[in-house]
Swiss-Prot record:
PANTHER family attached to this UniProt entry: MOLYBDOPTERIN COFACTOR SYNTHESIS PROTEIN A
InterPro entries on file: MoaC, MoaC_bact/euk, MoaC_sf, MoCo_biosynth_MoaA/MoaC, Mopterin_CF_biosynth-C_dom
GO molecular function: cyclic pyranopterin monophosphate synthase activity
CDD domains associated with the record: MoaC_PE (cd01420)
Pathway: Cofactor biosynthesis; molybdopterin biosynthesis
Primary role: Catalyzes the conversion of (8S)-3',8-cyclo-7,8-dihydroguanosine 5'-triphosphate to cyclic pyranopterin monophosphate (cPMP).
Name this polypeptide is given: Cyclic pyranopterin monophosphate synthase
NCBIfam families: moaC, PRK09364.1
Gene3D superfamilies reported for this sequence: Molybdopterin cofactor biosynthesis C (MoaC) domain (3.30.70.640)
Organism: Campylobacter jejuni subsp. doylei (strain ATCC BAA-1458 / RM4099 / 269.97)
EC category name: lyase
Catalyzed reaction equations: (8S)-3',8-cyclo-7,8-dihydroguanosine 5'-triphosphate = cyclic pyranopterin phosphate + diphosphate
């Protein structure tokens, strides 16, 4: 299999998408952060010294999705038309699952934007609570689904 991000001399390159059709693209990604009961309670009770953790993580996820092409070298800058977030609490496990959905009309997909949004959002939670729990674990950052483009539809489950 030939990698599209390498030229004939094996040098990195950004893929030329100028001949591709503009189509509707959408991707959803998710990830989970596990923490101590104390850290979970601080987030739930909105008593973190750095401010409202989950609300800040949502803003960070949106910013992370928007800035993807600036931090992932071969990603194309995209005009995103929608970024939606959701946070699911797992009380028994002391965990939060962050879900990010990104949409655009473009020539290339938005999977990396969704994955970046999740990663940055979860890292923001870690940053805001690390004084309480340095053993937090960020895990299972995955692409849940994607639509549009040549490769069509993908759904994890």
């Amino acid at each position: 299999m030939k990698l599209s991000h390498l030229d004939e001399k094996n040098h990195p390159k950004m893929v030329d998408v100028s001949d591709k059709n503009i189509t509707s693209r959408m991707a959803t990604a998710s990830g989970v952060i596990y923490m101590s009961q104390e850290a979970f309670d601080v987030i739930k009770n909105n008593t973190a010294k750095k401010g409202p953790v989950l609300q800040t993580a949502i803003v960070a996820a949106i910013m992370g999705a928007k800035k993807t092409s600036e931090i992932i070298p071969m990603c194309h800058p995209l005009m995103l038309s929608k970024i939606e977030t959701d946070i699911v609490e797992f009380v028994k496990e002391c965990a939060f699952k962050l879900i990010v959905t990104v949409k655009c009309e473009g020539k290339t997909g938005v999977e990396m934007e969704a994955l970046s949004g999740v990663s940055i959002g979860l890292l923001t939670i870690y940053d805001m609570i690390k004084a309480i729990d340095k053993s937090m674990r960020i895990t299972d950052i995955v692409l849940e689904s994607k639509e549009g483009g040549k490769s069509g539809k993908f759904v994890r489950y």
